[in-house]
Amino acid sequence: GIPCAESCVYIPCLTSAGCSCKSKVCYRN
């Protein structure tokens, strides 16, 4: 997927933007 702007190590991903956590990085589905 396409990496989002934030990581998900300390804070959750912006699921509203269609991003999910994979390998400590948020990716767009």
From Swiss-Prot:
GO biological process: defense response
Pfam families reported in the protein's UniProt record: Cyclotide
Cysteines joined through disulfide linkages: C4-C19, C8-C21, C13-C26
Signal peptide boundaries: none
Superkingdom of source: Eukaryota
SUPFAM superfamilies with a match to the protein in the record: Cyclotides (SSF57038)
InterPro entries the UniProt entry points to: Cyclotide, Cyclotide_bracelet_CS, Cyclotide_sf
Modification(s) after translation: This is a cyclic peptide. Contains 3 disulfide bonds.
PROSITE patterns listed in its UniProt record: CYCLOTIDE (PS51052), CYCLOTIDE_BRACELET (PS60008)
Keywords per UniProt: Disulfide bond, Knottin, Plant defense
Function: Probably participates in a plant defense mechanism.
Domain comment quoted from the record: The presence of a 'disulfide through disulfide knot' structurally defines this protein as a knottin.
Family, similarity comment: Belongs to the cyclotide family. Bracelet subfamily.
Protein name: Cyclotide mra2
The organism of origin for this protein: Melicytus ramiflorus
